[in-house]
Amino acid sequence: MTIPNKFLAFRIHQEEKTVRPALEEITLEDLTEGEVIVKNSYSSINYKDALAATGAGKILRKFPLVGGVDVAGTVIESSDPTLKPGDKVLAACSGLSETNDGGYSEYSRLTSNAAIKIPENITPRTAMAIG
């Protein structure tokens, strides 16, 4: 699968003391570093995400960041030998939407220790629902 040059993400910015979320086009280079590139299928919306997007809680440690503290999807590329293209993975917390870009994007770049391989008998949707 080819990764497009630009894709959509829900990104949170801070300008002076004002937090401003926006749906915008970004590139893979805009994402935080990670060994695993994932085509995202599912994320969730929870209280912590709302705090991050509104600035009501001091969730994000740096700006801008893609929101979403969890994500499930399919590995596209990986330099980690334990995760191969086509593997289904889940990442929850692990600094997502705090110090690393989160799951509200068409693609994510995850650290290999954040990406958990989903067992074959569980769909990414079910894994996301369980967390």
Where are these regions (language model features)?
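Eukaryotic N-terminal low-complexity, Ser/Thr- and Lys/Arg-rich leader segments
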Residues: M1-F7
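A structural motif shared across PLP-dependent enzymes of the aminotransferase-like
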Residues: L96-S112
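Cytochrome P450 core scaffold surrounding the K-helix E-X-X-R motif
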Residues: K48-T54
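Short beta-strand or tight-loop elements
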Residues: N5, A22-E24, V71
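A glycine-rich, Thr/Ser-enriched phosphate-binding loop motif common to dinucleotide/cofactor-binding enzymes
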Residues: E120-G131
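Short gly/ser/thr-rich secondary-structure transition/capping motifs
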Residues: K17-L23, A56-G57
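Glycine-rich beta-strand-centered segment in the early N-terminal region that forms part
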Residues: T27-I45, A56-L96, A114, P119-I122
